[in-house]
Amino acid sequence: MKRLSALLLTCLLSAVSSLSALAADADPDVLKVALLPDENASELIKRNQPLKDYLEEHLDKKVQLIVTTDYSSMIEAMRFGRIDLAYFGPLSYVMAKSKSDIEPFAAMVIDGKPTYRSVIIANVASGVNEYADLKGKRMAYGDRASTSSHLIPKTVLLETADLTGGQDYEQHFVGTHDAVAVNVANGNADAGGLSEVIFNHAAERGLIDPSKVKVLGYSGEYPQYPWAMRSNLSPELKTKVRDVFVGIDDPEVLRNFKAEAFAPITDADYDVIRNMGSLLGLDFATM
């Protein structure tokens, strides 16, 4: 009886999700754009004002920037049609795609490539000089749904040093990339993994003292953070959104993303993330 009730509840929630998505406006007057909650929310809103202005001008629509409390909240907001566009991390995109009908359409180009790296850092006083030294130590990650601050560094440690999180070292989820850098610099964690770009930005704006941390290594190149949109937006609006993003040439907008341009992407570009999840035994639909 309990199993039947659970099954009925699952079906009901799925139906509600589908109806909510269907009910979402195909051509909304105000476009709700969610930003990846990997840094301070007010800082993200302020820094992305040029993007908001650019989109309003070129899409001829009002734009509302949204920063959810965490990755899971953003995934659920997209699932229920409460946001129209979202700037995901690769892992959070794959998770969202497994739960909702969305389409990736653009990603940043940096140094001529639509790819990026994670960096693994250590506190200089931790006694950690290489990955193998992390055995028995405290490793800080960002959000569980983060690619560059969880999935990638965890995979690097597994593949290069045969270290399993929660088994060979303590793993602590501190929420954001910034928090990873701060916890490592302050000695609350021996090491941590985060986006190379965000690590460099944290040092540049004085969030951490660079002399308190050292770089242990970098990951390989992975597909950049994707912009995605609801599939049930009107075909005309979807085409316009794609064209506007790929055509962004405003220096201020690009500078805030530390990008040279935006390039078209497809769902298949993120199969490498799905493969990493399989290696770690992750079920994206239940995360």
Swiss-Prot record:
GO terms for cellular component: ATP-binding cassette (ABC) transporter complex. Coiled coil: none annotated. Pfam families: Phosphonate-bd. GO terms for biological process: transmembrane transport. SUPFAM superfamilies: Periplasmic binding protein-like II. It comes from Stutzerimonas stutzeri (Pseudomonas stutzeri). The keyword Cell inner membrane does not apply. It comes from the Bacteria. Keywords: Signal, Transport. Residues 1-23 form the signal peptide. This is Probable phosphite transport system-binding protein PtxB. Probably forms part of a binding-protein-dependent phosphite transporter. Required for oxidation of phosphite to phosphate. InterPro entries: PhnD (IPR005770). Belongs to the phosphate/phosphite/phosphonate binding protein family.
